[in-house]
């Protein structure tokens, strides 16, 4: 699919995008691993369910990526524990408040640097991976600063940071809880469509943590 746009001065630009259409994914109870790669990622912690998740991950010898926040400061010590157990600790947001972090580039990076300082205090290392609250293509940010995501993506990359989105959602971020069984089904169904899956879960949701076990 090719797009052509022009501005008021008559400057024109074209872009070509490949759009892939897949058949609907059939409901599945298990995944035939084959050559699939699945990355488990957990946002918004650490919180009161993170310790239990860490123990489950140890049980199955699985390593994940935690995109951490400071929204539950009483659990900051678990950031160190995540790193100690061999997981990747990455930046999500200190506040996770869209109406603050997306008001300007300065506000975003102030929040990012605050969270990185917390991570470094706990682990001894700077984080090199981030996940934008809402993802890199979120639409909520335009309510506060239209066009900011394009600039932030460029700025983050220029700073040598890697930003990570997801292509499989567990569905656990809804306003109301869903069952552990539904989280499991959402993930199993979602990974069928990808050879490489990045799964989004939240370790502040007990029903989602329970899905791991």
What are these regions (language model features)?
Residues 1-21:
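Serine/threonine-rich, repeat-prone extracellular segments and beta-strand-based repeat modules
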Residues 3-5, 47, 205:
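Alpha-helix initiation/capping motif
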Residues 8, 16, 24, 28, ...:
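Compositionally biased, intrinsically disordered low-complexity segments
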Residues 8-10, 33, 194:
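Surface-exposed coil/turn segments at beta-strand junctions on protein surfaces, enriched
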Residues 22-132:
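Active-site beta->alpha N-cap acidic-glycine motif
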Residues 74, 96-213:
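Catalytic domains of cell-wall/extracellular-matrix polysaccharide-remodeling enzymes
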